[in-house]
């Protein structure tokens, strides 16, 4: 990237997460958790006290410390950069904030072609704080891989069009159906922003990336293919030259797994609504799977957690027999805020034995 030096990518000699993601045989079953750095950890709550979410995301030292917390506590096999999917939008100059108890709120929703054409682009220097956070982490993590991430164009579009979180995505779908030309222009802009954000992280040294399409489960397979897939596919194509594993995840996307696999990622994330065995059939051979414990199971006591973890490991082994390239144990969504962190630590130890 112009004006930014590229960090020499680390050589990690024993990284089970990277092995599973690339079709090699890991030394143990790798495990990490979406939202592992967050409100379930008392040390996180203490560190974030009085500091806004977006403010935290633009403080390199804070980003580094928060990202490291679950590595120290749980011994997971990968770190995921502490950030938020709207960070590149905020960095580019879009007026938005993350409101406690609500989520991202956009001051001026995007509703017309003029609104789309007025959207800013993301310049590398605008995410310099994130880049510095990545560099600090690369130095701090030792042999633990670092996953960078971004929100997928569709999910970012939904926030911009709706003005915030939405249950039914009615304004988003209305634009899709009534004005597909404007829709694709909007997603083109957001795809450029997503690529720029991921490229900045890759140039700074992340070892893998995950694209979060949080709201894609609101779409039918036909609509996903027509209105979303080409843009997500472009994201994965544009960053392929970095040579790191690319993960694709959405919530409620069981019916979309085949299409999501076609987008070009190396790993497809699976939520708890579809077994890993069935996911392997839908995604097809040659791609690793990630998931898929229901986060609510962590509230059900140690026997239930162990039973479900063993079931998932067995389903994953069947998925491997069907042609899946690997398995990375994870939840089917993020860690819930009231989760007992001790349960997560015990789960990591169990998964490493399975």
From Swiss-Prot:
Site entry (Transition state stabilizer), positions: 84
Which pathway or pathways does this protein act in?
Porphyrin-containing compound metabolism; protoporphyrin-IX biosynthesis; coproporphyrinogen-III from 5-aminolevulinate: step 4/4
One matching Pfam family, short form? URO-D
User: Its Enzyme Commission number?
Assistant: 4.1.1.37
Q: Where in the cell is it found?
A: Cytoplasm
Quote the Gene3D superfamilies the UniProt record gives.
3.20.20.210
Quote one Gene Ontology molecular function term: uroporphyrinogen decarboxylase activity
Kindly list the biological process annotations in GO that this record carries: protoporphyrinogen IX biosynthetic process
Which keywords belong to this entry? Cytoplasm, Decarboxylase, Lyase, Porphyrin biosynthesis
Residues binding substrate are 35-39, 84, 159, 214, 333
Query: Which InterPro entries does the protein's record reference?
Result: UROD/MetE-like_sf (IPR038071), Uroporphyrinogen_deCO2ase_HemE (IPR006361), Uroporphyrinogen_deCOase (IPR000257)
Disulfide pattern: none
Is Cytoplasm one of the keywords? yes
Catalytic reaction equation(s):
uroporphyrinogen III + 4 H(+) = coproporphyrinogen III + 4 CO2
Q: Could you state one GO cellular component term attached to this entry?
A: cytosol
Predominant subcellular localization, coarse grouping: cytoplasm
Q: Which HAMAP family match?
A: URO_D
Task of the protein: Catalyzes the decarboxylation of four acetate groups of uroporphyrinogen-III to yield coproporphyrinogen-III.
Name this protein carries in UniProt: Uroporphyrinogen decarboxylase
